């Protein structure tokens, strides 16, 4: 009886491990071009400037198994600001990355890898810890389902509606030239 229980337990454990492994997509699926279509933050700068912000773009590429590069193109009143940041994977428990140069930790909260990703960023600047959530979409038109997921996750992190901005589309600032 004991052997049977142990065998069933091991079989169940193997089955759960196989199922979990089968549902974890290849990390490289998050690579490619993304539109930053929504933001949530409680920083003074964001709350003051959010109505002037437009949709940004990002291109994610993998440099190695545990390292990725993100190229950004963000429209500003005086032109298009572009930069790149390299992140290293810090955890096997989910997609968590850290950038030494930007002093920023990013975590993939939710994604289907095909159409949307919700990213949560934490950064320490001038002794203050700042947080921002971003909704990434593969196209400028984000699905209502992805928007609902973003708003739900924002609410779970105590962001109010005033702290969330859906960004208007723009065409002049792209990652294609980064």
Swiss-Prot record:
Disulfide bonds, paired cysteine numbers: 80-173
Assigned protein family: Belongs to the calycin superfamily. Lipocalin family.
Transport found in the keyword field: yes
Subcellular location: Secreted
Source superkingdom: Eukaryota
Role description: Siderocalin-like lipocalin tightly binding a variety of bacterial ferric siderophores, also binds long-chain unsaturated fatty acids such as linoleic acid, oleic acid, arachidonic acid and, with a lower affinity, long chain saturated fatty acids such as steraic acid. May act as an antibacterial factor, through dual ligand specificity, both as a siderophore-sequestrating molecule and a lysophosphatidic acid (LPA) sensor.
Main location per the UniProt record: secreted
Signal peptide: 1-20
Protein name as annotated: Extracellular fatty acid-binding protein
Keywords tagged on the record: Antibiotic, Antimicrobial, Disulfide bond, Immunity, Innate immunity, Iron, Secreted, Signal, Transport
CDD domains in the cross-refs: lipocalin_Ex-FABP-like (cd19439)
UniProt xrefs under PROSITE patterns: LIPOCALIN
One Gene Ontology term of the molecular function aspect: arachidonate binding
Positions of enterobactin binding: 43, 104, 123, 134
Example GO BP: defense response to bacterium
Description of how the protein assembles with itself and partners: Monomer.
Ligand binding (1-tetradecanoyl-sn-glycerol 3-phosphate): 72, 104, 134-136
InterPro entries listed in its UniProt record: Calycin, Lipocalin, Lipocalin_CS, Lipocln_cytosolic_FA-bd_dom
CC terms in the record's Gene Ontology section: extracellular region
